Amino acid sequence: MTVSFENKDFNQFINSSKFLVEYDVMSALKQEGLKQSDYVEICRRLNRGPNRNELGMFGVMWSEHCCYRNSRPLLKNLPTTGSRILVGPGENAGVVDIGFGQRLVFKIESHNHPSAVEPFQGAATGVGGILRDIFTMGARPIALLNALRFGPLDDEKNISLLEGVVAGISHYGNCVGVPTIGGEVGFDSSYSGNPLVNVMGLGLMETEEIVCSGASGIDFPVLYVGNTTGRDGMGGASFASSELSKTSIDDRPAVQVGDPFLEKGLIEACLEAFKTGYVIAAQDMGAAGLTCSCSEMASKGEVGIELNLDLVPAREKGMTAYEFLLSESQERMLFVVKPGSEEELRELFIRWGLYVEVVGKVLKEKVVRVIHKGEVVANLPASALADDTPIEEHLLINSTPEYLQEHWKWTEDLLPKTLDNGIINIKNNLFISWNNVLLDLLSMPSIASKNWIYKQYDYQVQSNTVVSPGEADAAVIRIRSQNDFLTKPKKDRGIASVVDCNDRWVYLDPLRGSMSAVAEAARNLSSVGAEPIAITNNLNFSSPDKPVGFWQLSMSCEGITKACLALSTPVTGGNVSLYNDTKLQNNTVLPIHPTPVIGMVGLIEDINKICKKSWVKAEDQIWMIGLPLENNINQDERISLSASSFLEYIHGLKTGRPPEIDLNLEKQVHAFLREVIKQGIVNSAHDLGDGGLAVAIAECCISSGYGANIILPPSQSRLDRLLFAEGGARVLVSCSTDQSEELKKYYKNISLQGSNLFSISHLGNVNNQKKLLVSQSNNTIIDVNILDLKDTYKDAIHKKITK
């Protein structure tokens, strides 16, 4: 449904006797983030003017954050079905079947705007919110990941944001006892005023009784459980649905305050309560608080809910109905339970130190009815709040935006000619050796080790973490059964998970960049030996009200759809965060890079056969799976210096069109990689990402302490292209001499069965000399000590912060 209204008639409309209200409509609409056309539509549905409480409820529920009014038409095209999918989009989290009576529950959410205002609490409550999404489904939380974006660390403000966000994530996750096992962090000037904080949660359940959120049972009691309700987080959903400005940066009351120790009790109490069989439906109170939980539970169950605010545990005296309804105080849940179970459940929750009250009941009439001080203060159709919400009409431009047309004109021919020992740097017209190019790339915070961040997280709590952060291309945790009655698998199984997005690529081509995000996530999972099974996505974009912004979002959704269909990784749900723009003091608006973060999960049948990225022993041979290094002048468009880290960080150019994404190639490479890992043919695996071949080899050397001898084939291609180009579905593996014969044999066998789109290329061998040596035609190209590589890579972020 699309709503529209002519401004010139609005004053006449609101002053008509039928829709007259006792408040200033214009100022109220501004406060709630609603349009005049929204107000007209609300009046049409109610056949009266809404009171002030009701308008506030519509304000949060019709915000982009809650109803996806700009993105819903695009999201419906995402693939959401598959053989393992048990619960897809629409519930608190997605659920997939991983066999042996076990289900994996997972989702990703953003807390971007709150983290810009108050980084510690904004990030901490982001963790708390995603954990509630997980255990509300009946699953025990087992892991967390995060995807973060900040402005350059040359700015003290960005350093402060980074420190605050990492501290908030660390504090909440560590205190609640859920390991933060991985993630990704990027830095770009577009995020200087608008950092991104995306948190992904995973949970394990071993019962068929998935707890859903749709209410049922006329007159069944509605139970409030958890923390008290205060004035923190007021209007958080509306705040998250508008661009950041100096005014909103100072809007600290819109940021919630979390209590991880109370959340820990809430987790245990809820999981215990679910086992009783008394809980009919459950919904956490996140964005829009009581308003959202009541309206969504009622709408999904096609019933109504009566809520008595006089019974809600209050943190502060004198709270109004409006404040109760819009508060986003943390660690709160709403249950529908079986009649007669109230006292038993009350004792259970009190034992865990939680507030618990019967605050309402399920109604036959499909409304959300709110009572305060003995009077009805709101009475609204549940579907109007949570289901039948407005959809914005946007005209999709039918041609590539001008900014991209200009970027796509760039070609590698515009770079200075390469020499055997280096290149002229366009940024300052000075010569730079290949050694220093590599060291400079490794010192860039987006590429460098994130050890300064990881070491603040407790990633070993629960004792199921198999791979420490940074050791492999994906995080891996052991699946440890919680129930003795389940049939046990013969081998120790695991779950691999990853979050991925090359935002520079998406900025320079939203379609290819988004396809690449899905493909890289699947490649990273395959690099540890995991079979990718499903994704959750977090679409972080700028304003869709601008034609370019909506085009970027549309192209990104199309790219995700294509890649998910090709790689058989359906979407189980996720989050959309729009209006990630910063209004500068001169009134110009700075949009972020479009950043569709892909959270992907995969299944490992035997965790004893996973691969890390470290070389394992000296003299192992180094191979590359995927597209080969070129040996002629004809360039493969699937590999390029365009949009590369080399181009941006060495030459200061963020331009060019990212490489073509060959999804059939990706699929073949992933399958081959998983099989050779399963058969024990390779000892290590690491995909080529930011910085291309040279950076990938350096990372393998740094993590292992071993060196490498790499011999580039004779080629007419540019040296920088061979060393630093990106793309091509390429993965480095290492194996012994005997294993190398097995690798070649297996590749030959599958070649006989069909057409291979990829090759395996021998590049060199692991050495014990503690040096990375790269040569071509007997000319030394790179000769760097591993300790120098390690010091540069490991200390880069710490040095930036403490400079």
From Swiss-Prot:
<keyword id="KW-0479">Metal-binding</keyword>
<dbReference type="GO" id="GO:0004642">
    <property type="term" value="F:phosphoribosylformylglycinamidine synthase activity"/>
</dbReference>
<keyword id="KW-0547">Nucleotide-binding</keyword>
<dbReference type="InterPro" id="IPR010918">
    <property type="entry name" value="PurM-like_C_dom"/>
</dbReference>
<feature type="active site">
    <location>
        <position position="65"/>
    </location>
</feature>
<comment type="pathway">
    <text>Purine metabolism; IMP biosynthesis via de novo pathway; 5-amino-1-(5-phospho-D-ribosyl)imidazole from N(2)-formyl-N(1)-(5-phospho-D-ribosyl)glycinamide: step 1/2.</text>
</comment>
<feature type="binding site">
    <location>
        <position position="537"/>
    </location>
    <ligand>
        <name>ATP</name>
    </ligand>
</feature>
<feature type="binding site">
    <location>
        <position position="68"/>
    </location>
    <ligand>
        <name>ATP</name>
    </ligand>
</feature>
<feature type="binding site">
    <location>
        <position position="109"/>
    </location>
    <ligand>
        <name>Mg(2+) 1</name>
    </ligand>
</feature>
<feature type="binding site">
    <location>
        <position position="574"/>
    </location>
    <ligand>
        <name>ATP</name>
    </ligand>
</feature>
<feature type="binding site">
    <location>
        <position position="133"/>
    </location>
    <ligand>
        <name>Mg(2+) 2</name>
    </ligand>
</feature>
<dbReference type="Pfam" id="PF18072">
    <property type="entry name" value="FGAR-AT_linker"/>
</dbReference>
<comment type="subunit">
    <text>Monomer. Part of the FGAM synthase complex composed of 1 PurL, 1 PurQ and 2 PurS subunits.</text>
</comment>
<feature type="binding site">
    <location>
        <begin position="328"/>
        <end position="330"/>
    </location>
    <ligand>
        <name>substrate</name>
    </ligand>
</feature>
<dbReference type="InterPro" id="IPR010074">
    <property type="entry name" value="PRibForGlyAmidine_synth_PurL"/>
</dbReference>
<dbReference type="InterPro" id="IPR036921">
    <property type="entry name" value="PurM-like_N_sf"/>
</dbReference>
<dbReference type="Pfam" id="PF00586">
    <property type="entry name" value="AIRS"/>
</dbReference>
<dbReference type="InterPro" id="IPR041609">
    <property type="entry name" value="PurL_linker"/>
</dbReference>
<dbReference type="GO" id="GO:0006189">
    <property type="term" value="P:'de novo' IMP biosynthetic process"/>
</dbReference>
<dbReference type="GO" id="GO:0000287">
    <property type="term" value="F:magnesium ion binding"/>
</dbReference>
<dbReference type="GO" id="GO:0005737">
    <property type="term" value="C:cytoplasm"/>
</dbReference>
<protein>
    <recommendedName>
        <fullName>Phosphoribosylformylglycinamidine synthase subunit PurL</fullName>
        <ecNumber>6.3.5.3</ecNumber>
    </recommendedName>
</protein>
<feature type="binding site">
    <location>
        <position position="107"/>
    </location>
    <ligand>
        <name>ATP</name>
    </ligand>
</feature>
<keyword id="KW-0460">Magnesium</keyword>
<comment type="similarity">
    <text>Belongs to the FGAMS family.</text>
</comment>
<keyword id="KW-0436">Ligase</keyword>
<feature type="binding site">
    <location>
        <position position="284"/>
    </location>
    <ligand>
        <name>Mg(2+) 2</name>
    </ligand>
</feature>
<keyword id="KW-0963">Cytoplasm</keyword>
<keyword id="KW-0067">ATP-binding</keyword>
<feature type="binding site">
    <location>
        <begin position="110"/>
        <end position="113"/>
    </location>
    <ligand>
        <name>substrate</name>
    </ligand>
</feature>
<feature type="active site" description="Proton acceptor">
    <location>
        <position position="111"/>
    </location>
</feature>
<feature type="binding site">
    <location>
        <position position="256"/>
    </location>
    <ligand>
        <name>substrate</name>
    </ligand>
</feature>
<dbReference type="InterPro" id="IPR016188">
    <property type="entry name" value="PurM-like_N"/>
</dbReference>
<dbReference type="Pfam" id="PF02769">
    <property type="entry name" value="AIRS_C"/>
</dbReference>
<feature type="binding site">
    <location>
        <position position="132"/>
    </location>
    <ligand>
        <name>substrate</name>
    </ligand>
</feature>
<comment type="function">
    <text>Part of the phosphoribosylformylglycinamidine synthase complex involved in the purines biosynthetic pathway. Catalyzes the ATP-dependent conversion of formylglycinamide ribonucleotide (FGAR) and glutamine to yield formylglycinamidine ribonucleotide (FGAM) and glutamate. The FGAM synthase complex is composed of three subunits. PurQ produces an ammonia molecule by converting glutamine to glutamate. PurL transfers the ammonia molecule to FGAR to form FGAM in an ATP-dependent manner.</text>
</comment>
<feature type="binding site">
    <location>
        <position position="577"/>
    </location>
    <ligand>
        <name>substrate</name>
    </ligand>
</feature>
<dbReference type="GO" id="GO:0005524">
    <property type="term" value="F:ATP binding"/>
</dbReference>
<dbReference type="InterPro" id="IPR036676">
    <property type="entry name" value="PurM-like_C_sf"/>
</dbReference>
<feature type="binding site">
    <location>
        <position position="575"/>
    </location>
    <ligand>
        <name>Mg(2+) 1</name>
    </ligand>
</feature>
<keyword id="KW-0658">Purine biosynthesis</keyword>
